[in-house]
Every structure is written in structure tokens, then in C-alpha cells.
Amino acid sequence: MTSTNLDFSQLAADIKLWGRELGFQELGISDTDLSREEMFLQQWLDSGYQGDMDYMARHGTARTRPDELVPGTVRVISVRLNYLPVAARDSWETLDDPDAAFISRYALGRDYHKVMRAKLQALATNVEQRIGDRKSVV
């Protein structure tokens, strides 16, 4: 199927369903006009709120102009994935235990980036199979 004869409302609903099936807690689909957000990001960076996260200021407008990063971009799919393992011990319980070490929550499970990339690639594959004539970038 090509994108010219797709029901885009149904495609959006399917993408959100696939996202839930893959374990994403939230999934949003937006266009590529982030001009308003670009202004807020620049104010945030100018205020130094990024702290030591120097990467936040790198790459100029590539964060807010998706078409500059990947020419031809028409939509952006954003997802949220909790990475706190369900079986993680309560933080305060661990801190109160002199015989236990406290490990940052992000380090308790499998590498978040690997988990996220695999799930995003599965989502991209579903999208590409449905639309046929477009490419997804993870």
C-alpha cells in the first residue's frame, strides 16, 4: 500500500496501538513545525538549565528542525518508556539498610538505549510495512 491511498487517522491509531503493544507508556505523533518549541529550548539553554549536559546545545537547530536532520521528514513519533524495573526495591528501604548498596535506578535493568532502540525499530518496521513507500528513521 502506498501513502496516497492510506487512511491516516487509522494509521495513527494503529501506530499508537503498536506502541502500547511494544510497552511504550505514551506515544505522540506531531508535525515538524517546532518553531515555538525552538524558542523555548533556546531560552532554556541560554539560562544554563542543561547543566553538564553539553550535548543538549550541540547540533544547532537539528533538534527542532527535523527536516534538516532527515530531509523529507513529514511526521515525528515521540514515545515514553519507563525503565524502572517493576521488582526494584524501594529506594528508602535500600538507603536505610547498612548492608545494602544503592544503585541508581537507570542502572538496574538492561541498558535503556538498547531496549529503546529495539522497540523503536520494531515500531518502525510496522510503520514501513503499512505505508510501503516511506522510510522510518530510528
Q: Which sequence ranges carry the predicted segments?
A:
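Auxiliary alpha/beta "docking" domains used to position bulky ligands
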Residues: 1-138
